[in-house]
Amino acid sequence: MTPKELVVLASKLGATTFYGIPDPFRGMSRAEIKAALPQIQHQAEQRGLATMGFDLSFSVNTEAAEIISACTMCDGYLTVDAVIDGVREPREVLYRSDCNSILLRDEHDVITLQK
């Protein structure tokens, strides 16, 4: 998923902050963000992360909701930013809560979450 999709899905689940990743909407006005939402929601639906209803309701699928919520409601997180031989490695963030550990890998335009 994209960073914007991740933040929109997390927001739909009630998150006000997503620690460990840069704000993908930084520099955008409220109007620009609002205009971009339908396209972001459509992309999330195409990836199977969410469902769009006929009444334009938008809901996050159960598996995606479980993993994203574990990140946003974590007890703590660890961010790893590494440079090897002058080449920046993808950012990795480990989120830890009572029963879950989730690894986020941020490769700029693509974010993967792994249990």
Q: How would you name each of these model-derived features?
A:
Residues M1-E45, T51-D55, S59-A65:
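Short, amphipathic alpha-helical interface elements at domain boundaries
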Residues K12, R26, R30, R47, ...:
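Arginine residue identity/basic-tract feature
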Residues T51-S101, E107-K115:
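Accessory beta->alpha helical hairpin/"wing" motif in late/C-terminal subdomains of nucleic-acid enzymes
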